[in-house]
Swiss-Prot record:
GO cellular component: cytoplasm
Family listed: Belongs to the endoribonuclease YbeY family.
The protein's Enzyme Commission number: 3.1.-.-
Gene3D superfamilies for the chain: Metalloproteases ('zincins'), catalytic domain
InterPro entries in the cross-refs: MetalPrtase_cat_dom_sf_prd (IPR023091), YbeY (IPR002036), YbeY_CS (IPR020549)
One GO MF term attached to the UniProt entry: RNA endonuclease activity
Broad enzyme group: hydrolase
Annotated protein name in UniProt: Endoribonuclease YbeY
NCBIfam families associated with the record: rRNA maturation RNase YbeY
Keyword Cell inner membrane (UniProt): no
Length: 156
């Protein structure tokens, strides 16, 4: 199983070990979700100010958040699918606030590793079409999240 992950660290404080952890968590999720080899995702690490800006500009929520996902496969009205056999499947972009991840790890009483793995997985599942807007969807997404985290060894 090979997921292509492009990391961008705008904070310049994310250690290689954290990127490796995220890579492994997302590889596990891709395997469990039967995502084909060569699919791509980008993961960008930002500060609270930057994620607040993105949240405001794209989601009309003027506040920092922990993770934002931009799925590439969501087709809007009037959009056409581009078919290319040689093109890798681009799943989308994940944007993670490092300060928010640290705050939440402390708030929830678990490690920064666990919080970072959780946020990356949560965002990744959104890229795959999971959501938590309804009670039923939330149950499905959170159940899958728990399953993957436990399979990886990051359960609570």
């Amino acid at each position: 199983m090979s997921l292509l992950i492009d990391f961008i660290d705008e904070t310049e404080e994310v250690k290689e070990e954290y990127m490796s952890l995220i890579r492994e968590v997302l590889e596990k999720a891709a395997q469990m979700e039967n995502i084909e080899d060569g699919a791509e995702v980008s993961v960008t690490f930002v500060d609270n100010e930057r994620i607040r800006e993105i949240n405001r500009d794209y989601r009309d929520k003027d506040q920092p958040t922990d993770v934002i996902s931009f799925a590439m496969e969501e087709m809007g009205e009037g959009e056409m699918e581009i078919v290319g056999a040689e093109m890798p499947r681009m799943l989308g972009d994940l944007i993670i606030s490092i300060p928010r991840a640290k705050e939440q790890a402390e708030e929830y009483g678990h490690s920064f590793d666990r919080e970072l793995g959780f946020l990356a997985l949560h965002g990744f599942l959104h890229l795959l079409g999971y959501d938590h807007m309804t009670e039923e969807d939330e149950k499905e997404m959170f159940g899958r999240q728990k399953e993957i985290l436990e399979a990886f060894g990051l359960g609570r």
